[in-house]
């Protein structure tokens, strides 16, 4: 019962963090777009955020294994509060270069915060589900991932609304205060021992020695790179500059998209028939859904290129893309926990989400470059190429896992 209570506390803290993270992303994007930043310059604002995610997940997995989930979770919340306060001191009289460096630093802190919090919440699931209960594990992973994205979408909307009503500075102060209260409450309720490994992990163990986890991590790099290469900068800027949408419209639309995407993730287990061993059917479904996602992305790219009812094509295409991507993401998030041992779950999850952050970093960088060079179509072509690579590696998971099982017999 105590484990369940701890899981609820960790999840609630992560939900609160996610709401501010989504709002901050939209605040920064919209605020600096109004200041005249180019698509590539907007992308650079998030580069350190994503880069720090790569490093944080590696080290955070080791910290969680050695010192417990409480330390990593509270550290993440505290760093996000600090990041929000720092950004509120941004001065329009500063030079462009100094302002950029200042925002990069604050965003870097936020990137560390986000991945410490996420790694903590994902690891906590494995600690409360019995080893053989694969179906429950999948459902809890899907529920957490889906609710996280739904709240991030709500955060996008919140960011747009706060920017319109309160302005940049007061919006940041409001979020920092709310998150600080959540930090105090979580510190009071959580025991220090949650998530500590019985064996003291060495720092070199942050790199996975498991072939299936390595392959899944590579697939994750390209899967999330494909999403962010057109979603982070290209799509919002296209909606603002080409379709002349307002800030509220862009924030609201992206919020609804992510909320819908999160809802689909939550219900993904109902679309997948569970296998007794927890992976055989799931691996086949993962490959099939990757192929479907590639076809959907190809259709969107062709529709935008030939200018076939651009707004409608984009709206329906985004709905289909979000649905397929949500199922793929939920499957991959489940598989990493299925492949992990309970005693080193934070190490495995940390390594895997380091790959996830690397994909977002690559996608964020390419989003600004591709859009500036070739527009939305160019960003979609890059996304499709990355999805094809992710599909190939996903298809390699089955043979890799079978070889591992054969060696253990």
Give residue spans per PLM region.
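Helix-to-loop junctions at the C-terminal end of transmembrane segments
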Residues: 56-69, 163, 264-282, 371
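C-terminal ends and interior cores of transmembrane alpha-helices
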Residues: 78-96, 291-307
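Conserved MFS/SLC helix-loop-helix module at the cytosolic interface between two early adjacent transmembrane helices
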Residues: 55-92
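C-terminal transmembrane helical hairpin of 12-TM major facilitator-type secondary transporters
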Residues: 282-332
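Transmembrane alpha-helices of Major Facilitator/SLC transporters
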Residues: 53-55, 252-277, 293-296
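Hydrophobic core of transmembrane alpha-helices in multi-pass small-molecule transporters
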Residues: 15, 83, 96-117, 311-327
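Cytoplasmic helix-loop-helix junction between adjacent transmembrane helices
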Residues: 106-148
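Helix-loop boundary and gating motifs at the non-cytosolic
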Residues: 2-52, 214-257
